[in-house]
Design a protein with these regions (language model features):
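Helix-loop junctions on the outward
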Residues: 31-33, 49-72
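Hydrophobic alpha-helical transmembrane segments of multi-pass membrane proteins
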Residues: 14-17, 36-57, 168-182
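Membrane-proximal helix-loop-helix units in multi-pass membrane proteins
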Residues: 80-82, 86-152
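Membrane-interface helix-boundary motifs at transmembrane edges
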Residues: 25-39, 89-97, 149-159
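Haloarchaeal acidic low-complexity proteome signature biased toward cell-envelope/secretome components but also
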Residues: 1-5, 32-35, 142-162, 216-250
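Alpha-helical transmembrane segments in multipass membrane proteins, preferentially the mid-helix core
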Residues: 18-24, 133-157, 173-181
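Hydrophobic transmembrane alpha-helical segments in integral membrane proteins
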Residues: 1-18
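Extracellular/periplasmic helix-loop-helix junctions in multi-pass membrane proteins
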Residues: 176-201
């Protein structure tokens, strides 16, 4: 059986190769589209470093069943932040909905850590926060973000739908792996749990990168839309301030 350290180093090597490939791919994009492309590079690069930290045993905490590295969840927080940012920009939704999406994701992730550390009733209560986080994530993805995505170009709508489906499938898979792990329901041992989580991470990052970087038309349209959106928001703020001044004068 392969030990965890070897698995983590091997995974980090795979992610390093993916990050390099994504970086070269991004450099071939139009200048305006590279910002979204660099989010892909950041997500993959952060998880590459995360797996190296896990291999070194950095930031480990004692959980029910075995020691776990909090570094994985710090990496997840940054990488999923990059994913949420891209989804929000592609959909054209307001920033508050992107933050709501990220908030739901982070709540579920860190509640999972809490459920591992705290056993008994406290662990059960924290598990409810996992469900709440998934609920917020799903409601945001299938609610305001989906509605706004219907108002943008067909290329962006298609990319949003694919990213949404990938996010839901991978995220639910990661949470299911965490719940079935030795720290919770103990349906899987440590080796199986780590292997499943590692596989899902590679699928998630490869899928995210491939979907985003191949959708050049969607990236270009989203980039062109940003200045227009900013101008509209600025105009609305100016109009509101002018109206307020006139009313005060009256």
């Amino acid at each position: 059986m392969i030990d965890h350290t070897t698995t983590f180093v091997l995974t980090s090597t795979i992610l390093a190769a993916m990050t390099t490939l994504f970086l070269l791919w991004v450099r071939r994009l139009e200048a305006g589209s590279r910002r979204l492309g660099y989010a892909v590079v950041a997500a993959s690069g952060v998880m590459c470093v995360t797996y190296l930290l896990m291999a070194a045993g950095v930031l480990t905490v004692s959980t029910t069943g075995r020691d776990e590295s909090v570094a994985r969840f710090l990496g997840y927080s940054i990488a999923w932040g990059a994913v949420a940012s891209v989804i929000g920009l592609i959909s054209g939704a307001e920033r508050r909905y992107t933050l709501a999406l990220l908030g739901g994701i982070l709540l579920s992730l860190w509640a999972t850590v809490g459920s591992w550390i705290l056993g008994g009733t406290a662990g059960t209560v924290i598990s409810l926060a996992i469900v709440a986080g998934v609920g917020v994530m799903g409601a945001t993805l299938y609610g305001p973000l989906a509605r706004q995505a219907q108002t943008v170009s067909s290329e962006r709508t298609l990319l949003f739908s694919r990213l949404r489906n990938l996010t839901v499938l991978v995220f639910v898979g990661l949470l299911a792996t965490g719940m079935l792990s030795a720290q919770n329901l103990a349906f899987t041992d440590a080796f199986v749990g780590q292997t499943l989580a590692t596989y899902l991470d590679i699928v998630w990052l490869a899928g995210f990168g491939g979907l985003v970087l191949r959708s050049t038309d969607a990236l270009a349209d989203a980039t062109d839309d940003r200045p227009a959106t900013a101008a509209v928001n600025s105009s609305s703020s100016t109009d509101g301030a002018t109206t307020g001044s006139v009313q005060s004068a009256d």
